[in-house]
């Protein structure tokens, strides 16, 4: 092996395999762009985003870590969410949960 060399297995890497997902339509009713990061608790996003908020409790965007989705003013788009993993305890964000899901 050469220092720094990558040894990558053949095939595709599937993100969040086996976890429950949800696809829903989200609209930005505000007058400014809103960007949501990959691990932000979607239930607690900006109130200008219009969607079935209750159905998103305990979920985040199903996108690669470190990336984000941007919603321009007046824009509507479909997004896919995935269940949060781990201990399923949420603190911070908008302060709407602050504990166990």
From Swiss-Prot:
The keyword Chaperone does not apply. GO terms for cellular component: urease complex. It comes from the Bacteria. It is found in: Cytoplasm. GO terms for molecular function: urease activity. Pfam families: Urease_beta. Pathway: Nitrogen metabolism; urea degradation; CO(2) and NH(3) from urea (urease route): step 1/1. Its EC number is 3.5.1.5. It catalyses: urea + 2 H2O + H(+) = hydrogencarbonate + 2 NH4(+). One of its GO terms (biological process) is urea catabolic process. Keywords: Cytoplasm, Hydrolase. Belongs to the urease beta subunit family. This is Urease subunit beta. It comes from Ectopseudomonas mendocina (strain ymp). The gene is ureB.
């Amino acid at each position: 092996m050469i220092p720094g060399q990558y040894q990558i297995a053949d095939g595709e890497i599937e993100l969040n395999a086996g976890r429950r997902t949800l696809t829903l339509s989200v609209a930005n009713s505000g007058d400014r762009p809103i960007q949501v990061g990959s691990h932000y608790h979607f239930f607690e996003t900006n109130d200008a985003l219009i969607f079935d908020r209750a159905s998103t409790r305990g979920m985040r965007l199903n996108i690669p870590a470190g990336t984000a989705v941007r919603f321009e003013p007046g824009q509507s788009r479909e997004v896919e969410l995935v269940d949060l993993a781990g201990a399923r305890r949420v603190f911070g964000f908008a302060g709407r949960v602050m504990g166990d899901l």
